[in-house]
């Protein structure tokens, strides 16, 4: 049996831009992608803390060190610059692997800089 487990999480990312006229996807600072092991074209779920929207798209690399989080194409209708979002990816794994799995969770500040890295999802991530 396979289980779908959280693999990566960028917690409390701030949307820096939305670009309706781009083909699609979410552009993420490549440093943030590396921190939580996201790959270009990987499917992600976006949860908008400001309006409750949940949707899926795929990742494209953004410039390193700028903290950019840009929703593109139709997804741009779901966010506004300044919105706080959670970016999640999942992986399917067999039960034994799932029991030992530790996701990569990055807690971000208001400038999308990593303030803490976690190896699991704690009971409270209120910061």
UniProtKB/Swiss-Prot annotation:
CDD domains: Asp_decarbox. The keyword Lyase applies. The modification Pyruvic acid (Ser) is found at residue 25. Keywords: Autocatalytic cleavage, Cytoplasm, Decarboxylase, Lyase, Pantothenate biosynthesis, Pyruvate, Schiff base, Zymogen. One of its GO terms (cellular component) is cytosol. It is an enzyme of class 4 (lyase). Substrate binds at residues 57, 73-75. Its EC number is 4.1.1.11. GO terms for molecular function: aspartate 1-decarboxylase activity. Belongs to the PanD family. Catalyzes the pyruvoyl-dependent decarboxylation of aspartate to produce beta-alanine. NCBIfam families: panD (TIGR00223). This is Aspartate 1-decarboxylase. It comes from Shouchella clausii (strain KSM-K16) (Alkalihalobacillus clausii).
């Amino acid at each position: 049996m396979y289980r779908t487990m959280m693999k990566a999480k960028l917690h409390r990312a701030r949307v820096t831009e939305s670009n309706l006229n781009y083909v699609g996807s979410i552009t993420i600072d490549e440093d943030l992608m590396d921190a939580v092991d996201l790959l270009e074209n990987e499917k992600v779920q976006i949860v908008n803390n400001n309006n409750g929207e949940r949707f899926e798209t795929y990742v494209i690399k953004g410039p390193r060190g700028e903290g950019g989080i840009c929703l593109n194409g139709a997804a741009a209708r779901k966010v506004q610059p300044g919105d706080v979002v959670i970016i999640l990816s999942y992986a399917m794994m067999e039960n034994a692997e799932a029991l030992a799995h530790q996701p990569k969770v990055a807690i971000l500040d208001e400038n999308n800089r990593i303030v803490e890295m976690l190896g699991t999802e704690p009971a409270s991530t209120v910061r």
